[in-house]
């Protein structure tokens, strides 16, 4: 994502060469990537893409990682057939491109996916995880849908509004200390609002020395210095889901 006040490139980082363990399906008007859990525990997680789209191998890798921990996962195409952002594209037109892909206007898609998970996957407990653009979506959805048992927003831009604290269920926020997209003052604002007003469990973690995209767009072996932070963030994500689902 780019900061809305100061659009800047969102580095695609390391694009994984990853085939995936799941399959593509059609859910009403949406294409989606689904991975069934090896253990049918009646739990599912919606994984929400970043600006590079639902087919980015890195996002599917994360969905498969979550699935391996006991959850059926689904990565829907929340752009609904519109092209994802091309990392080699002209960043001067990014703000206009983004206007047609509003992370807070995906209710029709969420309704279809929830129906699919309940009817076709027999999910009784559902959570959500989102990266970048998807992190914004998670924050929005956790303030709107009480049926999401747990949410994890990974470096989603903090939108300043009076109700950013109004979470309905436990939510984990993961940020990077050196994120040029999300200034630490925005993280401090969110921290303050939640501390003053939030009535459910939440946690905000900011990872030292890390940059935007570190959780899902860096290979685990890319740097000995980064690997512990990547591992910890991914572990925290799974632990949060396990605790509240």
Curated annotation (Swiss-Prot):
Assigned GO CC terms: cytosol
Species for this entry: Pongo abelii
N6-acetyllysine modified-residue sites: 36
Listed name of the protein: Carboxymethylenebutenolidase homolog
Compartment(s) where it occurs, according to its Swiss-Prot or TrEMBL record: Cytoplasm, Cytosol
In-chain residues carrying the UniProt-annotated modification Phosphoserine: 223
Keywords, comma-separated and alphabetical: Acetylation, Cytoplasm, Hydrolase, Phosphoprotein
Family classification: Belongs to the dienelactone hydrolase family.
Enzyme Commission number(s): 3.1.-.-
Major localization listed first in the record, in broad terms: cytoplasm
Residues forming the catalytic site: 132, 179, 212
GO MF term list: hydrolase activity
Gene name, Swiss-Prot/TrEMBL: CMBL
Protein's job: Cysteine hydrolase.
């Amino acid at each position: 994502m780019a900061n809305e006040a100061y659009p800047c490139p969102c580095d695609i980082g390391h694009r994984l060469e990853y085939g995936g363990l799941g399959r593509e399906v059609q859910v009403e008007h949406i294409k989606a990537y689904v991975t069934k859990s090896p253990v049918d525990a009646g739990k599912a997680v919606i994984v929400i893409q970043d600006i590079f789209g639902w087919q980015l191998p890195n996002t599917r890798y994360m969905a498969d990682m979550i699935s391996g921990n006991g959850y059926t996962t689904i990565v829907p195409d929340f752009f609904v057939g519109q092209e994802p952002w091309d990392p080699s594209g002209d960043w001067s037109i990014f703000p206009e491109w983004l206007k047609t892909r509003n992370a807070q206007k995906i209710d029709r898609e969420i309704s279809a996916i929830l129906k699919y998970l309940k009817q076709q996957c027999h999910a009784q407990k559902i959570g959500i995880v989102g990266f970048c653009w998807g992190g914004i979506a998670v924050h929005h959805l956790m303030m709107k849908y009480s049926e999401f048992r747990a949410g994890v927003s990974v470096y989603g831009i903090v939108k300043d509004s009076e109700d950013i604290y109004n979470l309905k269920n436990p939510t984990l926020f993961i940020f990077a200390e050196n994120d040029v997209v999300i200034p630490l003052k925005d993280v401090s604002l969110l921290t303050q609002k939640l501390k003053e007003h939030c009535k459910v469990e939440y946690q905000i973690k900011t990872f030292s020395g890390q940059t935007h995209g570190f959780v899902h767009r860096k290979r685990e072996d890319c740097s000995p210095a980064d690997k512990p932070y990547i591992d910890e963030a991914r572990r925290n994500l799974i632990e949060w889901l396990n605790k509240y689902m």
